């Protein structure tokens, strides 16, 4: 009996050892894949005349490069702004289709503002839905400035998004209007790549709503606002040569994003060239990717090419898993 018991114990120990080795092998394999992606990305970033920050998030992996650096967000903050406006609409028991009256003295006629090609009169009415759409899809600065002045301020936007973000490594202090006057203020509106990637991933989570996130009363208006924001992010017309450069080869890919483009700093470097996106394959698998470039001593086209190259590498890595 003692001999049988000893044999049984030895077999049990052998099985436990085998299981531990298998689990260890799986862990090593997954780590090697993650490191492999980092190595592939470093081959791109190591030669860039600037600082490149990357964050990739999927259900299985999170990979970051230079994530501890503070990157000027530029118009990426309009994603945060749109979500804060959606919350404020809900808090006021209002609607995204509410209309505000705008007078010419509220507008900057010398800033980037495609909406002024449509709204040419000295005074006009425009819905909050359209202001959000202009701010997101064409990065309209007047639309953003109006939303900050009329609906929710930069500081309130910062506070509200901190309540919902999985990663609060960001700061929003100044509007487009203020940054135009003093370009260096753009460095104060910063984000880590991981924070931006986390936020856009949250937005496209099917369970995400303004109501449950901000613990306010549920209304159809708030859900309508989030749906509108999601739709707008899929029709962003700026920076199509950045993360979305992979889209023509993969038309079946769901893609939504928000770009940000910076001024030249005192060293004549491009202060910011950014894109944060959400990608979903037809099989339902999805990932978020943020690429932020700061202090780049090249052209915007060259910076876009770097972002596009990173997007291609990440896509190839993800679909091969």
Predicted regions and their residues:
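C-terminal motif of bacterial Sec signal peptides marking the signal peptidase cleavage site
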Residues: 23-25
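Short, conserved catalytic-motif segment at the N-terminal edge
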Residues: 49-71
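Structured C-terminal helix/loop/strand segments within mature extracytoplasmic catalytic/sensor domains
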Residues: 27-43, 48, 149-150, 154, ...
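Mid-domain, small-residue-enriched loop/turn segments at the edges of structured enzyme/sensor domains
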Residues: 144-207, 218
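Active-site SXXK
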Residues: 72-100, 135, 289
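Coil residues (strongly favoring Ser/Thr
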Residues: 47, 61-62, 98, 159, ...
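Conserved catalytic neighborhood of penicillin-recognizing serine enzymes
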Residues: 107-146
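Acidic helix-start/capping segments at beta-turn-to-alpha-helix junctions
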Residues: 96-115, 151-153, 232-233
């Amino acid at each position: 009996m003692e001999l049988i018991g000893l044999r049984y114990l030895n077999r049990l120990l052998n099985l436990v050892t085998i299981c531990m080795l298998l689990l260890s092998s799986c862990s090593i394999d997954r780590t090697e894949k993650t490191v492999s992606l980092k190595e592939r990305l470093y081959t791109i970033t190591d030669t860039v005349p600037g600082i490149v920050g990357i964050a990739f998030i999927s259900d299985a992996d999170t990979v970051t490069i230079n994530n501890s650096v503070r990157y000027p967000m530029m118009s990426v903050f309009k994603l945060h702004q749109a979500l804060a406006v959606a919350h404020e609409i809900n808090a006021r028991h209002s609607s995204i289709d509410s209309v505000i009256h705008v007078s010419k003295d509220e507008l900057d006629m010398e800033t980037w503002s495609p909406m002024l090609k449509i709204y040419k009169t000295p005074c006009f009415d425009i819905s909050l839905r359209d202001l959000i759409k202009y701010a997101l899809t064409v990065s309209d600065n007047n639309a953003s400035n109006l939303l900050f002045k009329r609906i929710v301020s930069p500081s309130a936007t910062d506070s509200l998004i901190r309540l919902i973000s999985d990663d609060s490594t960001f700061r929003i202090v100044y509007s487009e209007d203020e940054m135009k006057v003093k370009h260096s203020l753009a460095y104060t509106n910063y984000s880590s790549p991981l924070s931006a990637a986390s936020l856009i991933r949250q937005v496209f989570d099917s369970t995400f709503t303004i109501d449950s996130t901000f613990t306010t009363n549920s209304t159809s208006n708030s859900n309508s606002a989030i749906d509108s924001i999601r739709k707008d992010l899929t029709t962003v017309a700026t920076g199509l040569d950045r993360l979305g450069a992979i889209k023509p080869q993969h038309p079946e890919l769901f893609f939504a994003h928000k770009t940000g483009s910076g001024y030249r700093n005192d060293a004549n470097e491009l202060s910011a060239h950014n894109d944060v996106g959400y990608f979903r394959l037809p099989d339902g698998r999805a990932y978020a990717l943020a690429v932020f470039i700061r202090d780049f001593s090249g052209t915007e086209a060259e910076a876009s090419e770097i972002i596009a190259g990173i997007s291609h590498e990440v896509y190839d890595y993800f679909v091969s898993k």
